[in-house]
């Protein structure tokens, strides 16, 4: 019984993770000046943030602001990477597509707001 549940959680992580990355890549296409790369496997995902579309300029300030704003909206993220410009997403294994949509919506809303500045 426990093994079966574990297998379902692993399957869920793969299915939802693939969906989540696909949705995040749609956001990346809309905001290439902010997002250089989406990477990860399963539900362990990273979003590399940059300054003005320049791959050699990591955007630590934007990453920190994004995690702090999203924390106020109930989304817990962290930063990683040598420049702390990578948004690290590590949700629980029970994370589902609705949760992914919510996180994507919050990230997109944040970037829309930043883009207006």
Residue ranges and their predicted role:
Residues 1-117:
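Conserved N-terminal phosphate-binding loop of PLP-dependent enzymes in the Aspartate aminotransferase
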